[in-house]
Amino acid sequence: MLSGLVIVDKPQGWTSHDVVGRMRRLAGTRKVGHAGTLDPMATGVLVLGINKATRLLTYIVGTSKTYTATIRLGETTITDDAEGEVTEARTAAHITDDAVAVGVAALTGPIQQVPSSVSAIKVNGERSYARVRSGEEVKLAARPVTIHRFDVHSITRIDGGRVVDVDVTVECSSGTYIRALARDLGNALGIGGHLTALRRTQVGPYSLDQARTLEELAEELEVLEMSLAARSLMPNRELSEQETTEISFGRRIAAGPGAGTPDAATAEKPAAAFAPSGELVALLADTGSFAKPVLVFAPGTGTGTGTGQAK
């Protein structure tokens, strides 16, 4: 059974669910999921899991993300991006490069961010975007996010400065809305702002260099095999034959070298355990002097398919 990750370069106009549906047909299985939604207008890295690899997705969702984006200052939209109608316009002619830099700096580091109201966040069981589209005014609670990097690459004045386009790179924690960053930068400058372009270039350890378009995947389905996917995602632990046998049957073994330290493997941040053959056997968490399996992938005594890239 084919199992592994597929790194897709999502096309503009497709929902993440659309891409999952396409991959189900390409892989010949219903068991396909993704590790974090991309808005339809956005392009770039969308990590999919096939069959057993869907169990890795929960550990990818919480990783940092990197984006390139264009923020338009001087116009506010109902969706905080170019998909929505412009609700307010103010001239950006007086906005200097230094003012943009100050605004960006204030939005870098740990911040409290109010998500865009047109989002998939549920309010009393209903998606926020559905409430907004029905005419309801939705106010979402702020949540903590971290903007690790917010770099300005270029500032372009259009129509004599009526609007200003700012090209940026953002590296951020999971749960950050780049649309909300655009909105907040515009609001801080007193002229409003929204997102006009967004491309995700990295999700955790998986980058755009590894991504393939749906057309390329239709010609050759390139799958990152489970062992390789886990090795790049989390700390590794190499097992002996005896340890492999114990873990394969759900039994505990001696804790890893990081036990009792901040580097200890936990259920939320486990270590990937590999048989001598290189096969991914399980994900482990250290509890006291023992390590126990959080997930077991491979039954048996340590023989396996090794590592490699399945196609």
UniProtKB/Swiss-Prot annotation:
Entry GO MF terms: RNA binding; tRNA pseudouridine(55) synthase activity
Chain spans, region Disordered: 237-268
Catalysed reaction equations from the record: uridine(55) in tRNA = pseudouridine(55) in tRNA
Keywords for this protein: Isomerase, tRNA processing
CDD domains, A to Z: PseudoU_synth_EcTruB (cd02573)
UniProt enzyme class: isomerase
Biased composition (Low complexity): 254-268
EC number: 5.4.99.25
Record-annotated active site: 39
Protein purpose: Responsible for synthesis of pseudouridine from uracil-55 in the psi GC loop of transfer RNAs.
NCBIfam families, alphabetized: TruB
Name of the molecule in the record: tRNA pseudouridine synthase B
Species in which this protein is naturally found: Paenarthrobacter aurescens (strain TC1)
Gene name per UniProt: truB
